[in-house]
């Protein structure tokens, strides 16, 4: 699927946010008992658009399977793949902005190619992006994104 402009209209109850969700943030949002379950629930409801790449999907599957179960991983991946509010990109160019953990660059590259508004992460390796002028990539902490989702729901 090709990246879409932020002006795309989804449903009237969407934030029209295009985000990249770091694996550990996704993992924290999957359990119904989690404080951050709303992040997963709002994705399923189509309230924001998730930007992914094949390498991100592979990491999601591996980490969810190892921390939860292979079945949970399969359900999460199938849910993502069937959702209409997903942008799947193939980043042909790698920016190599994160040197402390080069594996994290797949999230940055996806965000740039998909024109995502920000990456939701708790990983301190992404802090380098705050001082990188090009390409501009914003980061938000999971609690900030959660609060944004809650604020959006308020009448």
Name each model feature, range by range.
Residues 25-26, 56, 125-126:
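Alpha-helix capping/helix-boundary segments
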Residues 22-23, 52-53, 122, 141:
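A secondary-structure boundary/capping signal
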Residues 21, 35-65:
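PIN/NYN-family metal-dependent endoribonuclease catalytic core
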Residues 2, 6, 124-155:
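Acidic, PIN/NYN-like endoribonuclease modules and their adjacent C-terminal/linker elements
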Residues 85-119, 124, 128:
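Active-site neighborhoods of divalent-metal-dependent phosphate/nucleic-acid chemistry enzymes
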Residues 2-33:
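Metal-dependent nucleic-acid phosphoesterase active-site entry motif
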Residues 42, 110, 131:
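Hydrophobic/aromatic ligand-binding patch that stacks against planar heteroaromatic rings
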């Amino acid at each position: 699927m090709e990246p879409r402009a932020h002006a795309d209209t989804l449903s009237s109850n969407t934030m029209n946010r295009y985000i990249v969700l770091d694996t550990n943030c996704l993992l924290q949002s999957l359990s119904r008992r989690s404080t951050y379950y709303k992040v997963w629930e709002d994705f399923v409801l189509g309230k924001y658009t998730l930007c992914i790449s094949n390498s991100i999907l592979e990491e999601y599957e591996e980490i969810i399977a190892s921390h939860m179960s292979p079945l949970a991983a399969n359900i999460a991946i199938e849910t993502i793949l069937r959702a209409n509010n997903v942008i799947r990109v193939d980043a042909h160019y790698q920016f190599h902005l994160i040197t402390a953990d080069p594996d994290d660059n797949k999230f940055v590259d996806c965000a740039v190619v998909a024109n995502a508004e920000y990456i939701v992460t708790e990983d301190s390796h992404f802090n380098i992006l705050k001082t990188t002028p090009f390409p501009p990539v914003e980061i938000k902490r999971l609690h900030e994104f959660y609060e944004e989702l809650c604020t959006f729901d308020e009448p």
